[in-house]
Amino acid sequence: MKTKALFLDRDGVINIDKKYVYKIEDFEFCDGIFELCRYFLARNYLLFIATNQSGIARGYYKESDFFKLCDYMLKEFAKQDIKIDKIYHCPHLEGCECRKPKAGMLLKAKDEFDLDMKNSIFIGDNLSDMQAGLNADIGTLILVNEEKKEGDFFRQFKNLKEILNFFKEKDI
């Protein structure tokens, strides 16, 4: 039987987006991220992070810096009894298959974990996240952004707590 997944963008969903975050001291978790993840873990979703990290290609930081921050982030999730199944990242600039809005990272997860994409969820903070989710045939696309964005193929919320309340009300 295929497994459901919750895909999360990193900057703007897991942590406050401060542009090219790669240092632990600059990494600040968004309010509600742990509660949201625990909710979906309790419903047998696998948890994945799919993040564009063009700061690597731009020379702002090294891939080793990204991995150090990932280790810190995963340890913080573990302290909250949350297991992130895998982090997918694109270190490139435009033009590659893995960079969102293309679906490369999401499709790689689908193949590696035999995921049921139609019953999976992707939460992102940019339209490129929503487009990537659409391109990967993910069933539920959620945009978390205080600025209203145009699009009819996703739902939009102002914050993670609103998203969690939405799913609790739907009893998903």
Curated annotation (Swiss-Prot):
GO cellular component: cytoplasm
One of the record's GO molecular function terms: magnesium ion binding
Positions of Zn(2+) binding: C90, H92, C96, C98
Disulfide bonds: none
Record site feature (Contributes to substrate recognition), residues: R99
Active site per the UniProt annotation: D9, D11
Listed Pfam families: PNK3P
Residues binding Mg(2+), per UniProt: D9, D11, D125
A Gene Ontology biological process term: ADP-L-glycero-beta-D-manno-heptose biosynthetic process
EC number: 3.1.3.83
Keywords attached to this entry: Capsule biogenesis/degradation, Carbohydrate metabolism, Cytoplasm, Hydrolase, Magnesium, Metal-binding, Zinc
Marked site: Stabilizes the phosphoryl group: T51, K100
Cofactors: Mg(2+); Zn(2+)
Cell location: Cytoplasm
Keyword field contains Magnesium: yes
Reaction(s) the record says it catalyses: D-glycero-alpha-D-manno-heptose 1,7-bisphosphate + H2O = D-glycero-alpha-D-manno-heptose 1-phosphate + phosphate
Pathway: Nucleotide-sugar biosynthesis; GDP-D-glycero-alpha-D-manno-heptose biosynthesis; GDP-D-glycero-alpha-D-manno-heptose from D-glycero-alpha-D-manno-heptose 7-phosphate: step 2/3; Capsule biogenesis; capsule polysaccharide biosynthesis; Nucleotide-sugar biosynthesis; ADP-L-glycero-beta-D-manno-heptose biosynthesis; ADP-L-glycero-beta-D-manno-heptose from D-glycero-beta-D-manno-heptose 7-phosphate: step 2/4; Bacterial outer membrane biogenesis; LOS core biosynthesis
Principal location listed in the UniProt entry: cytoplasm
Family: Belongs to the GmhB family.
Stated name of the protein: D-glycero-alpha-D-manno-heptose-1,7-bisphosphate 7-phosphatase
Organism: Campylobacter jejuni subsp. jejuni serotype O:2 (strain ATCC 700819 / NCTC 11168)
Record gene name: gmhB
